[in-house]
């Protein structure tokens, strides 16, 4: 038994099973929280993670109800059995329950305080909004507790808490307990009315909230004091009670948790401190909580699991990992991964949808809230320790734990309690072992009772049942208090005392995992309906549908139906109430308590006792048609029966497709009854079976039964003509030649080729993408099988299925002159075997699926240790899609169940290929050219700059409920229309273009819905948004457009974009729409007898997100009540807050479009309440916006709709800039719009508004970004570029050669580069210019960096470049003549420095070497900064020593890794260089070979995470001597020797004397390639070649330039007259919006010019000199970008201001000096000072600096350009992640002005670094810098100095 002694080890203490959350909640705010607590959970414990979760939960409820019926039927039989309760039964029951666990009379917050004393600096809370150590948590909670005491909080008081997920919740929770009060956690996402009811029941006079929820707190607790807690709360001293905190009795109330109540209001469960602690401590021992536990905090605060998540973790000394609300609900796997949590608890449904790497990364996975299947348990326990548990809220959080799931998947044994099973009708009667009974819980975990409900408490909290006081045999009777759970359970057969859950005995049900009293649902519905309506809520399982909560209604005045039907139409009064019930009911209860449908009956069925016959209602529910579940009632027009033969056949087909037996009338609408595009496709097939011919277009254009029947044609049911093998070959390519050609490409025999036909455009695109990224579009699926025999059976089924399905045997090859072709191969399948799933998956990912290889493969993995056999299938998306995969699985299942009886399909994939080949390409070209002619070029979201490569990195979700749909309009049409309206306001245009990915199965091919193969396709959708059009007209136009594009939807984006310049622009799709129609039926539960079912992903919509190539992908999953939208987006293009508002607008617009077809689009309100709030904030600060300063006399600036200023523009959307000023302007005037007047504060100016003619938008911070002139930007540009001219293509040979080089360097397609495009506008800078020059040399082209800056466009640059061969595209000869990096002769650079090289080597160099056996191959002098960094390596502080931490997430071959490290050293001479000293000068000695140290460390302390442990090793290492003559390179490897597959870390130590930020990424890539065996490391240029070139060529050639530039100059000093008493660093920073800058000026020039201007103004000088950090590589050396060594330099920049200069003049001057000095930047400052006769040595040094002043600048400006700053974080070859550590801080020598580019070049961070003593001076300097930069950006034409 675990004690609670005061021990330093911080071992296991308090525990609970904490849920991890859900990845795909339909309605995020009401999503339930999973826990390790079974179906009897009091306050909801399964999660609405996805459809699967809902199905399983509902199925469990249904089973519970069936069990109740069985109990009634077997009552007599069981009564007889109970009377036969044997002595043996009693012996066994009392043996299990003889000892009641001890009551632990302690408070959990006291235990946490003890932990804080033991581990003050350990992190207690790691949250999205910051972290807290135990010391900080203890201090803050104590301060807040004292403040609460002052406000009257005391023992006996209950304090509600209202917080979003935050670190401050934990602080508040502890503070309330320390103050002596009880807390009651609430979830702010629940309805306000419900929260108010909860608070009222607590009688609270004070409420504690977060700052964000303070306004909500005031609403739900009117009259109460609201204390908002945030960082600001503690920034100033809190008023506190002078009395000490009380000693809180353990018997006092700790918390109240609210659950569903049968009276219509939530009921509060009261738990004492000793209740909680007595359960928490034994749970800790059972589960394994430790001080190293990192517990993921998912649960909603409305559920008591969240209490355990915080308090039990802290009581163990562990770490609470708090995700953001968005991360918790929208990116579960990513949040768990980012938090590095090692303990997660959830429902099985949620665990199934986690990314594959999550579960293996955990130490503990807790499952509960749902029945855990044997297959789930078998799957997950092979990766982690699996726990199952259960517990109702009335007995704290959990009271059973099963920690041995290999024996059983039940809910386990009691912890902190004992458990009895009694007769459900009489708790004084025990039931025999093995029989079903009601579970009673006895022990200290049994709570106080229900708040304010003594009668209810007495009913279920009982005392002294007769069998307990009587005892048995040697077991003495006892008094006891027990809780009646209402859960039906039984003891398992293994006689271990473990318990199996069976069901419920009452009307309590589980909905989306929540415990719900049906009577509470009924109560709230009743309040929303007219009087006289009988209401019964039930969970039903309709035919072919998921378990669903519905409400049955019966009116007293109902007259019944004339045909005797059970169902009747509601009265007008009831109908009106039902039309708005979702809204009225949603204001009262959480969304999971709102029924999916309201079914009106002629009368409510009753039993003989006149009680409602719920069994009968459930039977009725089975027959309820699907159409009744999507709406409260339907309007189908006149109910005329089908008359013609076609109508009758079609009606039958409708019923089949809609899975409904409801009558279909002539006027019925297919879409009105639940049809959609998916079902339309299926209807084509169903109609064909009836002998009727239809197309999808026919169905959309003729949605009513009569119209559709009239359109149909009579056809034969015979299948279409079979496509013969090789009949689809291109002309001139015969079968024999084709077989030979493709067989050679596949590496097979010609006779093994069964067929060949072309690829689809989709397949071409997918193969092209995966050729660039090895793992792109490849999926792995794992199926865990029960035994090897099952595996063999599944293998045989797969083999048989592949014989019947050509797509499973298809490969893709690139045939010269014929393109990509698919080859059907007829050969025996091969498979792989293994013994470890994780190892195989890693190995399999390394095996590419290339052209000519198999694109489906499988393996059988037998893991004897885990006792499992797994079937692993790997497949390429070029051969399957989300539609075809279930068809493949169906074929495998057929072979599995009925071997030798193959499944027959009407068509194969080649039938679809034949259809594509038969299409008239000219017609498709004509269609798309017309569709996209004149399309608006601006798309949402906007590119930050031309050439930007999008990458989605964020995910948001929103559920959009739809109460109704316009007749004959589909949800898909509504979604397209709504998004078009939203997007239009963000681009300031009514012409909207976005992409849509379609199923592609609208093609008129027989059996198209059964074709096994990928048919998805993406098209550009152009939607004109006409404000004068009615909603109905708008929807109809979009629907007609989508139908009209069906014949052309497979033309392919890559082909559409080539049709015209407009088409090319339109196909630059930024946003993509993916629609997932609702399925016909509920997805079946996984059938254990059909293991292939596990190959289908549970969430098809979420699967689509893995293949997102858009900047914004909207995946919409439709259901009968609305649709769920998941937005995956690039946060650099659209920030998260803007995207969140856009989704709110999307939801609002969709709902408005659904409500009325006669509303004008111009009257559809696109802005949400959040938009209004955001605008209110920006309007309130409009007078302070920097843009105001750019207009003389302006008092404020706003953004208005450019087409209609009476309407608001949301934050992030484009509009026209309007200024407010009292000075008349020569601009268009504008009355103050009413919306603006309403938002303006009383103090706002009332001056007139003037339209400036400039387009602008509010950025994420609420500041105005000016995009440019309206005239030049409208309809022609992105926000980041000047007006785009028609692109002129390259025509000459030299232009095309240069364009190819641009494309490679800038990573921009050649088709996007025109003659008039500027290299720098497309993303180029000085570094990429240098790379271009280097790349051009092997191609026979000579270009200098200076030429590039002077001739920026492709046409200009091509005209000045020199070509060695202009007559041929071949560049072999030119390449042969291209210069290579010169290799210096050994020791030649010592000429002039030493008299005798041999003597110098023997007497100076070798004696200093650490190892006398080393052979020196060269010695060369060090460069200036290299020498400084050597000295900063050999002496303390060693600020030049860098530790690169490389974390491996999987198993590592240590021998291979060690060899790779040594090979990297051998590959780069700079790494095998050691340093020696002579005559105060440092020399570099290059060794022939060097075995660098490689030390191994055992990571055996799990109390410290790997990163911290490794960094401690590094800090110890840096203190060791690193003398001259020794290797600065060293390797440290940290791993757990007992867990070779666990995470490990390699540390690469080096000195800054050996690298700079340009060559280090190259070295890391080389290391990765060396470890991968099969890759040749990319070459690098030796540093000696660079030094030789610089010293022999660059320095002599450059000194005259510097001498002339700097003649008569002095280094500008900038030193406050303030003593330096504190030499610590002070860094002050501010972000500046530069989006309106002149784009032809590089990002490097702007901050340099800014500093020059600021320095000139501050010092009142017109001639300033300061230092810049440059790459040092612009030296004309071939391959300079690949030099392995430290080339960076400090160089001077001199600006002599002309009094007449404007900002444009300064920017041009600085850029020109950059161009001119680029070729001279290798010269060091020391060389300039010593050789140019500048007289700088007379200047004073910086205070405390003993070096010559001429060797250093007083101020340095550093542009941290993006591609130098950034490098890849993840190494795909070794699955690694990088982290950098500098152990020692660099002493400050000068003022530093640093800039960091952000937001794709639209903003920069300006940072000033100086001494702490000068910090205040630095703040003033930064303000001046910001002012100067804003002038250069916004007013570049303004003079710099007044006359």
From Swiss-Prot:
Residues 65-81 have a biased composition (Low complexity). Residues 133-528 are annotated as: Adenylation 1. It is an enzyme of class 6 (ligase). InterPro entries: AA_adenyl_dom, ACP-like_sf, AMP-bd_C_sf, AMP-binding_CS, AMP-dep_synth/lig_dom, ANL_N_sf, CAT-like_dom_sf, Condensatn. Its EC number is 6.3.2.-. GO terms for cellular component: cytoplasm. Disruption phenotype: Leads to increased sensitivity to oxidative stress and iron-starvation, reduced conidial germination as well as reduced virulence. Impairs the production of the 6 siderophores beauverichelin A, dimerumic acid (DA), Na-dimethyl coprogen (NADC), fusarinine A, fusarinine C (FsC), rhodotorulic acid (RA) and tenellin; but increases the production of mevalonolactone and eleutherazine B. It holds the Pfam family AMP-binding. Residues 753-1175 are annotated as: Condensation 1. Keywords: Ligase, Phosphopantetheine, Phosphoprotein, Repeat, Virulence. Its cofactor is pantetheine 4'-phosphate. Residues 641-716, 1289-1365 form the Carrier domain. GO terms for molecular function: ligase activity; phosphopantetheine binding. SUPFAM superfamilies: Acetyl-CoA synthetase-like, ACP-like, CoA-dependent acyltransferases. One of its GO terms (biological process) is secondary metabolite biosynthetic process. Residues 1-83, 628-647 are annotated as: Disordered. Residues 1447-1734 are annotated as: Condensation 2. SMART domains: PKS_PP. NCBIfam families: AA-adenyl-dom. PANTHER family: FATTY ACID SYNTHASE, NONRIBOSOMAL PEPTIDE SYNTHETASE. Belongs to the NRP synthetase family. Nonribosomal peptide synthetase; part of the gene cluster that mediates the biosynthesis of at least 11 siderophores, including beauverichelin A, dimerumic acid (DA), Na-dimethyl coprogen (NADC), eleutherazine B, ferricrocin (FC), fusarinine A, fusarinine C (FsC), metachelin A, mevalonolactone, rhodotorulic acid (RA) and tenellin. This cocktail of siderophores for iron metabolism is essential for virulence, and more specifically for the fungal virulence in penetrating through the host cuticle. Siderophore synthesis is also involved in conidial germination under iron-deficient conditions. This is Nonribosomal peptide synthetase SIDD. It comes from Beauveria bassiana (strain ARSEF 2860) (White muscardine disease fungus).
